[in-house]
Amino acid sequence: DRRLRQMCIRDRSNILDYESLPVDDFFTHILHAATESTIGPSLPALQRYDEIVDGTRNILDYAVKNNVKRILLTSSGGVYGPQPATMSKIPEGYLGIPDPLDPMSAYSIGKRAAEHLCSLYNQRFGLESVIARCFAFVGEDLPLRAHFAIGNFIHDALHSDKITVAGNGAPVR
């Protein structure tokens, strides 16, 4: 039996460079959570899209080549697109989509394409995948002054007596 080993690939590898992925390690499962998610000029839209899709394809190819049983892809609630005003919440099966003609949708459309790749690899190679459409990750690399509400709340708590909530309170998650 192969043993389940834990490894943070980001410490040793670059998912955009297939050759940098581990050679002598044995994995039964992969958690693919590598994505640049900041908004703004730090990463051009085409590069953001390519990194999501190409990185996912490399991870899937690696999984097939190394007989990995299952992959967990962290996707994004952004794949649903904007929440229609007529919906109080978005059901998981909702088939909305961000505007594919808007370059600002590169992250969300890239995540949707990554999900589709997982489906194709399941059909072609039998690679089981689970997709988690997450939002609001919190960790040491979270920008405290960007477009992430939780980061802004943490910044305000650390540097002010008041926590500012931007918006009208209508969004529900």
Model-derived features: positions:
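Single conserved hydrophobic/aromatic residue that forms the stacking wall/gate
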Residues: 1-9
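Small-residue (primarily alanine) positions within well-ordered alpha-helices
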Residues: 5, 34-35, 63, 114
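NAD(P)H-binding glycine-rich loop region in Rossmannoid oxidoreductase-like domains
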Residues: 15-51
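SDR active-site strand-loop-helix element
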Residues: 30-36, 71-77, 132-134
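Helix N-cap/beta-alpha junction loops of NAD(P)-dependent oxidoreductase domains
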Residues: 37-40, 82-83, 140
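A conserved pocket-lining segment of Rossmann-fold NAD(P)-dependent short-chain dehydrogenase/reductase
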Residues: 41-42, 95-102, 129-143, 152-173
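Catalytic helix-loop patch of NAD(P)-dependent Rossmann-fold dehydrogenases
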Residues: 46-58, 65, 70, 79, ...
